[in-house]
A protein has these predicted regions:
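Active-site segment of metal-dependent pyrophosphate-handling enzymes
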Residues: 23-24, 45-47, 51, 55-93
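Conserved Nudix-box catalytic region and its N-terminal flanking loop in Nudix hydrolases
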Residues: 2-5, 11-52
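Nudix hydrolase/Nudix homology domain
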Residues: 28-32, 76-80, 84, 88-146
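Structural signal for conserved beta-strand scaffold positions within catalytic alpha/beta enzyme cores
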Residues: 18, 69, 105-107
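Short acidic/polar alpha-helix capping motifs at helix-coil junctions
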Residues: 18-19, 35, 56-58, 62, ...
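Generic structural signal for well-ordered secondary structure
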Residues: 1-2, 104
Length: 146
């Protein structure tokens, strides 16, 4: 059985917003990852879990994350069916609501320099290449003059 999980990547000005997962995280504790992730609880839908994970932002249609990819993640501890969503933030006001004390914006170059070094979560390590070749590429192409 693969337990469903929701993860939400946040992109702002062509950069990924990442935070520390915390020392008590079951998978990849004390590593860098997206600010929003959650297990899908019994009898909850994936979409409702996305909204709940986003807190107050989950009520706003203009910042609702979009589904990107579903994949299986397995290690010695877990079997997860990961549902990766992405949220492209265009407003500083919204970004201020997302910001956490331990978070920062990362460029693709900064991320590439730290991949494989244990800085990022196992999930993120698997997802970054896909993000880079889809959403980040499109974001940078569309916002080249922004």
């Amino acid at each position: 059985y693969y337990h469903p999980v929701v993860r939400v990547a946040v992109i702002y000005q062509g950069m990924l917003y990442l935070v520390n997962r915390g020392k008590k995280s079951f998978v990849s504790p004390d590593t860098i990852d997206y600010p929003f992730y959650s297990y899908v609880l019994f009898r909850h839908s994936i979409e409702s879990t996305v909204r709940e994970t986003m807190g107050g932002l989950g009520e706003k249609e203009d910042v609702m994350p979009r589904f990107l990819i579903r994949y299986t993640f397995e290690n010695e501890k877990v079997k997860h069916l990961v549902n990766l969503y992405v949220m492209c933030v265009h407003s500083e006001k919204v970004m201020d609501q997302i910001k956490q004390p331990n978070g920062k914006l990362w460029t693709s170059k900064q991320i590439e320099e730290n991949l494989g070094s244990g800085v990022f979560s196992e999930y993120f390590e698997q997802e970054f290449a896909y993000l880079q070749n889809t959403v980040l590429l499109a974001e940078n192409f569309c916002c080249a003059g922004c």
